[in-house]
């Protein structure tokens, strides 16, 4: 999840019953100084900023923005990067734990994207030059 991307350096797949051997071990994530949950306000501020950075990059890029369910709400799988066998609290939505500022930020970017065509291609990319002089 997006929240896990900024909260964990390592996978935490113990609940999957495979001794944490399943799932990719190279997460390409960064915990910003604390593995998992924290009360450190500096770490929490940085994590929130990074989530907004990632959402903005996604929403302002060309193509169809793809979010994992709950990324806009701050959903976490507690560092489990392979929740394939988890039909339980780990992968369910927790509507009582919605990150309202992140949801509002994501909604504002979705509105911006919808209202300004510059953030959306009007035609499918075909590889041809955009300007006449590039391919004339």
Residue ranges and their predicted role:
Residues 1-136:
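Active-site and adjacent substrate-binding regions of carbohydrate-active enzymes
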């Amino acid at each position: 999840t997006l929240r896990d991307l900024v909260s964990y350096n390592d996978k935490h797949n113990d609940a999957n019953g495979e001794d944490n051997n399943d799932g990719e071990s190279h997460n390409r994530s960064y915990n910003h100084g604390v593995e998992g949950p924290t009360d450190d306000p500096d770490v929490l501020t940085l994590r929130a900023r990074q989530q907004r950075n990632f959402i903005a990059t996604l929403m302002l890029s060309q193509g169809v923005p793809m979010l994992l369910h709950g990324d806009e709400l701050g959903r976490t799988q507690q560092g489990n990067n392979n929740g394939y066998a988890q039909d339980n609290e780990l992968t369910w939505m927790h509507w009582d734990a919605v990150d309202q500022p992140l949801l509002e930020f994501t909604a504002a970017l979705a509105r911006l994207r919808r209202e300004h065509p510059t953030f959306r291609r009007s035609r499918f990319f075909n590889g041809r030059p955009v300007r006449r002089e590039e391919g004339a």
